[in-house]
Regions:
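Classical eukaryotic N-terminal signal peptides for Sec-dependent ER targeting/secretion
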Residues: 1-16
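Residues at the start of alpha-helices and the adjacent loop-to-helix junctions
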Residues: 5-6, 19, 39, 70
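Compositionally biased, low-complexity repeat tracts
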Residues: 6, 20-23, 58, 202
Length: 339
């Protein structure tokens, strides 16, 4: 069995660029008219960012999320890989350490021509989840989105509206009530929730897929990497929810054995194929001219669940495989240029 290693940032950037040059070349997509489309010819690539390293509740990864130099280096590397924004997991005042990390990321993003967004971790409590969410969103707006907030100009927007992602936990929040509150902001945010519409479809402006093995469930060898899950997500969004903002999903692998909450879940990197195929899956469902606005990499640095891309795109150790991949990218780029 081949071990996983990582390509250099240069190869990563080349591959990422190539992947987004070939839109329209990967099969016939059904006709669809999107309300929210990419502002350019390709989706903007963003990445989920964990800001909890340095606390005793999480494993040591050799750095703390409170080190400005670490964050500057991460931003520089992400930009070199074609990533334009970090989507930071955020828990409101439930996790002060993470809140402080977020402030650092936003400030440094503003100074380094990078973007940042918040992914709200819903409180998993039966009573008070709605009030908690409203209080957290209000806090976030006042501290990070107001005109005098440090680094507010770095916040990720679409057509001038800030994007806020929601990661559901327990589904106890009345999002219609939260929506009514945030609609009073100027500008009102675009709320993006995981998976397809649930009990409050009108409360959300868009949806994103999350790492999932698909209907066959988790395989011991990691061979169920999520192709059917992603296909179902994109098919449903194209056919039923083309009026919503669609954020695509991509993941390199998953192995959560290091996490204290481990469920022994595993998705094989397949020598980098899992990443490249998830990154491109959306193309099969959306034709040229109907490009989705964002693709979100899951994740930049979740080392506990083993979905990190910070070290680079997973590949295989054999030298010939790297040479073959480089040749494949160069050949495909030449073909694309001639089209």
């Amino acid at each position: 069995m081949l071990d996983n290693t990582y390509m250099s940032a240069g190869v990563s950037a080349t591959l990422l660029s190539f992947l987004f040059l070939i839109h329209g070349c990967l099969g016939q997509a059904p006709p669809v008219q999107l309300t929210y489309r990419a502002t350019g010819s390709s989706p903007e690539v963003i990445a989920v960012y964990e800001a909890w390293f340095g606390t005793p509740k999480h494993i040591s990864v050799g750095y703390t999320s409170h080190d400005p130099e670490v964050i500057r280096n991460q931003i520089r590397k992400a930009k070199g890989m074609g990533i334009s924004a970090f989507v930071v997991d955020w828990y409101g005042d439930r996790e002060p350490f993470i809140d402080q990390s977020y402030a650092l990321v936003q400030n440094l993003a503003a100074k380094n021509e990078f973007k940042v967004a918040m992914m709200y971790e819903e409180a998993n409590v039966e009573e008070g989840a709605t009030d908690e969410a409203i209080a957290d969103f209000t806090m976030f707006h006042d501290i990070y989105l107001s005109p005098d907030a440090p680094g507010h100009q770095a916040y990720l927007t679409y057509q001038g509206r800030p994007l806020i992602f929601v990661f559901p936990n327990g589904n106890h929040t009345d999002w219609a009530k939260v929506r009514a509150v945030v609609n009073k902001w100027n500008p009102a945010p675009l709320l993006i929730q995981e998976n397809l519409p649930g009990p409050h479809p009108d409360a959300f402006d868009g949806f994103y897929p999350w790492i999932n093995p698909g209907p066959l469930g988790w395989a011991a060898d990691g061979s169920n990497w999520g192709d059917r899950y992603l296909a179902d997500f994109y098919k449903n969004m194209a056919e039923k929810y083309s009026d919503k903002l669609i954020v695509g999903g991509a993941w390199p692998k998953l192995d959560d054995h290091k996490a204290s909450w481990s469920l022994n879940r595993h998705i094989s990197a397949r020598c980098g194929q899992t990443y490249t195929e998830t990154l491109n899956m959306w193309r099969k469902f959306f034709p040229a001219g109907q490009t989705i606005p964002f693709v979100m990499i899951e994740t930049w640095n979740d080392y506990e669940e083993g979905s990190e891309i910070e070290p680079g795109i997973p590949t295989c150790t054999e030298p010939s495989s790297k040479t073959a991949l480089n040749n494949q990218v160069k050949s495909s780029l030449a073909t694309t240029t001639q089209r």
